[in-house]
Amino acid sequence: MAAKNSLAKALKTVRKARGLSQEAFSDVSSRTYMSTLERNLKSPTLHKLAELCEVMKIHPLTLLTLAYAGDSPRKADELLAQVRRELEAVAKERDAAKPRA
């Protein structure tokens, strides 16, 4: 699950696809910071990732899915199915761990 390099690529891909310059993020980030993210020199916090995605008008999970699955719709479908299964399993485990009154 190596997505660190892919996150940089996904960020740049979405930014360019949306026709946004690095300067378009000036309300949430400097152009220099955007450049360091896109060159994989730094990793954003979850909060910063959400702010960047808001500028690009996408959900952070969309960006992360692109980072993990790349351009493959099949890989994206498999990843999203895995996430759904894991969320269901966590919910069942949480419910099973609740004390009964």
Question: Model-found features: residue ranges?
Answer:
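A short, Lys/Arg-rich alpha-helix, primarily the initiator
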Residues: M1-A17
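Residues that mark the N-terminal boundary/hinge immediately upstream of a DNA-recognition element
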Residues: A10, G19-S21, T45-K48, H59
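DNA major-groove recognition helix of helix-turn-helix
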Residues: S29, E38, K48, A67
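Short, basic-rich loop-to-helix N-cap that marks the start of a DNA-contacting helix
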Residues: N40-E54
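A contiguous, mid-protein "functional segment" used to position or interact
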Residues: A50-R74
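Short, charged recognition helix plus adjacent turn
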Residues: T65-A101
